[in-house]
Amino acid sequence: MADAAIRTCYAAGMDPDVLRIKTRLYSGNEIAMGPGKADLLEAIAQHGSISAAGRALGMSYRRTWLLVDAMNRCWREPLVQTAAGGSHGGGAQLTPLGHSVLGDYRALQKRLSAAAADAPEQAALVAALLPDPRPTRD
């Protein structure tokens, strides 16, 4: 975040991270990649399992599997490769395209956040934003 925006946040008693950029890539109407799906890919790479990745992220196995299925349907090749269970256990790993998409997505997130941090519009938005929303009227 630009220095002016940070100073404005602190002066207003607000968290300097109040404006966050969320990058989503779409395939048709389906979110092909977003912050949560990138976190899931990282967890699968770390744990080697869809179920373990879901547990680490506090997601049900069904939710985790649906997200993996959605990602695999949105790209020219699957991002996650699975192996069936059995006596040796199953598992999951990122494909080469999965590693590439994850790396490119994280780099794009970083670049877009840096560009927004330097934008004077961000300081103006922070200056106009309330620290907390007003209560609703009953």
Positions of predicted regions on the chain:
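C-terminal regulatory/oligomerization modules of transcriptional regulators
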Residues: 118-138
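Short helix-boundary/capping micro-motifs
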Residues: 44-53
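Residues within the DNA-recognition helix of helix-turn-helix
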Residues: 67
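Residue cluster at the C-terminal edge of the helix-turn-helix DNA-binding motif
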Residues: 73-78
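Short, Lys/Arg-enriched N-terminal segment that forms or immediately precedes the first helix
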Residues: 16-29
